[in-house]
């Protein structure tokens, strides 16, 4: 544990992107504001686990900290599976689903999303139509030719809402691909 007086060392605060105090890092988690010893212990236990990442991003999205989530994904691209786990869970709250979508939109056309193609295809096969709809959108955001066949199949989904999102996503994807 390293404690830094940011009045004496503002350079360290700038380097770490600290804008509020207290601020701390536990593993990949950056925590702001006051936390009880029990909360800090809980976050320390979560650090380094997949379930902990899911909780971390859920907390960020629920508290309107999208910029922090975007910065974290840019810094730790290996966290993207935690967001896909949130997208895969039909019980994920709407505010969290919106946050996940915003991060995916920010990563549109990037290798970060393209490297998740197999996971996105699995989401497209999910039993829940909301998850399949989100998968359609995410597949279009990959800007990857391989997403076309998956989206074409989803235009025949038994759920009309999924069909509509698949058609829109297919149209969006084709706009970005070279002809």
Write out the residue ranges for each language-model feature.
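Short inter-helical turns and helix N-cap capping residues of alpha-solenoid HEAT/ARM repeat scaffolds
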Residues: 91-93, 127-128, 158-159
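Amphipathic alpha-helical scaffolding segments comprising HEAT/armadillo-like alpha-solenoid repeats
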Residues: 53-54, 76-89, 110-125, 144-156, ...
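Structural micro-motif
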Residues: 13-27
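Thiol-based oxidoreductase modules, predominantly thioredoxin-like and allied folds used
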Residues: 1-12, 18
